[in-house]
Every structure is written in structure tokens, then in C-alpha cells.
Amino acid sequence: MTCQPVMDCPVTLVIKAPNQKYDDQTINCFLDWTVEKLKSHLSKVYPSKPSAKDQRLVYSGKLLLDHLLLKDVLRKQDEYHMVHLVCASRTPPSSPKASKSSKSMGTSSSGRSSSSGSANPGSTSQDTSSTYPDPRPGESIRHRHTPLMYNNLVHSHPYSYLRQEYALNPPPGQEAPSIFPAYSAFTPLQMMWWQQLYARQYYIYSQATASNQSTSNGENAQPVPRPVTNSENPPPNPPRAPPNVAPEINPNIQMNAQGGPVMNEEDINRDWLDWIYTVSRAAILLSIVYFYSSFSRFVMVMGALILVYMHQAGWFPLLQDEGQQHPGDNAAEVNPDLVNNNDPQELERRMDDGLQEVHNNDAGVNVVARQGVLASAWSFITTFFTSLIPEGPPQGVN
């Protein structure tokens, strides 16, 4: 069915309530209606019969004003238009006296029930429902929180029983406090926040006190009395213990804090771009040597670079520290000296050996100096050539 004028075609509106108390209502209207006329129509056909002044209509996240026409607001390509109906509350909040009297009635009834020793669940539920009534159907979600509900929230807090216990059973020597006022300078949510802050500060203070007591107990510990020895017969001196020779520490050890196998990050991060960069550097170096020298020199330089690289990789260890000894051998040599330290003949023999070593050291000074010059020259040459070759990733030592 097609309509000749657009204004005469009915439009279908789906009215949704935010509090979900009523099902979605489908209403037919016309595009030439204003929002005010639609509100008056809803006050007649909607189940809760809300007044036009209390209605708020929201379409596509926008509040519809009363003077707007539906043809200027609704999208023409949609078949159904979803409109949200929000009703403002006209009920004034309850007075503080009523809430205070209801609280006193609740405390007196709870005192009577505790003194009798038997509680009725059915009556408790009825009292709760009568003390905290449900919101009326015409109210929306944002206006359903009454002062009584916030008061119930405060009394349901875990720390609220401390105040009730202090009010019912005061400490000896003190009078029972007066009834707590129903309304204070702070809101119920602020009171809850202050209670949580106080509990946390009290916990921190108790922890600090306990740690200080444990520290003072450790400092005030009595020293262990020493056994009394006879001055006439002193005990013999015990033999000195051999020095603890610590094993040699490898400075290249890699640690893994995660507890898994040791993995070198440089080996993992060497992608194809890194390899291309390394190969390009080597190619530039070799091209310079090849174009600016003869073929024989190029072969000699290539061979030298390969040998230096293999030596750096650890395939040809040319220089070995022959003077290094195992720590166990030094410990084995130290122990006989400690054992024979009190022998006078052994002391004389060691003095004679020391004189002979002085003469031998004077004769070997020149040899050591000559070896130092050769070692320095070899170190300079190897360092120069190895600096021309790009270094590879360090080998992980487990």
C-alpha cells in the first residue's frame, strides 16, 4: 500500500522503557506530529499513563525537544523507529525523621529478637520489605536510590558491626554512647571510605610494631658465656686451618633469570638483514684489496684473514697460558708449608732456596723483557687484523 502524500503515511514507533518493567510498546503515528503531541498520545496509550511533563524521549542518542517535528527527526529509510521513554520522578524524598524512626524501630526489634533467642525468617523478610519499599512503576532507574537504600548499604558494610557492638556492650568504666545520628557531615559512601582507610592504617601500624619488637629482641639477646680456662695450664694452640682457595670464576658465564636454558639474544635477533649487512662489509673490504693490489697479494690477505678469523673463533689456539695452574695444586703446595712451619731445619732450607732464587731471577730478567716485547708485537698485529673483520656473536657458556 502506497500513500500519495508522505505526511499521511503512518510511522511505526517502538517505545522502550529503561527500567524494563513494561514490554516494548508499538505505536503508530504520523510524520507531521510534534514531539509534544506524541507525548500526549503516550500519556493515554502507555500502560503506566505518564504525564506529558514527566516524559523524556530519546532517539538515536538525542533528546527530542517538544517543538520538533517527527519528519525532521526520524530516519526515512528505517521501517521501525526505536524510541526510549524516560520518566522523571515527582515523588519527594523521605524526611530524615522517618528514616530515624524506622532505624530505631529496626534496632529495638532486633534487640527483642536476640533476647528471645529465636528468630523467624518470614518476619525478617517482611520487616525488610516494609522498611525498604520497592520503587514505584513510574520511576526510572536513575531515581530509584533512596536514602534508606544508602543507609542499608552502610550498615551492611563489614565494619559496621563494630559500631553496633560498641553501642550495645560498652567497655568497663565508660558509659554507653548515645544513638548514632542518622545523618552526619559525611555521606554514607564517604563513611565507608574512611572506615577502609582506618582499617588499612591500623594494619600497617600493627605490622610496624611487630617488626620493631622482633628487631629489639634480636639486639637484646644475651651473649653466650665463654668457658673459664685455667691460667696455669693453658690449652695448646690448635693447628691453623688451610686457606679456602676459591675456584676460578669464569667471567663469561651467562645467567638466565627465567630458569630455562641459556639462550643468547644476539643469536636469536640476527635476522637476514643483519647477515646481509655483515656480508656487504666483507665484500667491500675484499673488493678494495682486490682492485688496488695484485692477485697474489689478494690471496695472501685472504689467507691471513681466514687464519685470524679461525684463531679468533678458537680453532687454532696459538698462545696458551702455560703458567696457569689448577687451584688444587696451589692448595696442595700450601698445606705442607703450613704443616712444617714450626721445623727449624725446614726454615733454614727455605732461606737457602730463597737466596738461590734471587740469583736466578737476576739472570732471567733479560729473558722476560725480551719475551714481553715479542708478546706486545704479536698482540698489536693480531689486534689490527682482527679489527678489520666484523665480530660474530659471542658464544654462550653454560
From Swiss-Prot:
Q: Which InterPro entries match?
A: HERPUD1/2, Ubiquitin-like_dom, Ubiquitin-like_domsf
User: Where is it mainly found?
Assistant: membrane
Comp. bias (Low complexity)? 96-125
GO term, biological process aspect, one: endoplasmic reticulum unfolded protein response
This protein's GO cellular component annotations are: membrane
* UniProt xrefs under SMART domains: UBQ
Q: Which Pfam families match?
A: ubiquitin
Entry protein name: Homocysteine-responsive endoplasmic reticulum-resident ubiquitin-like domain member 2 protein
* Organism (species): Xenopus laevis (African clawed frog)
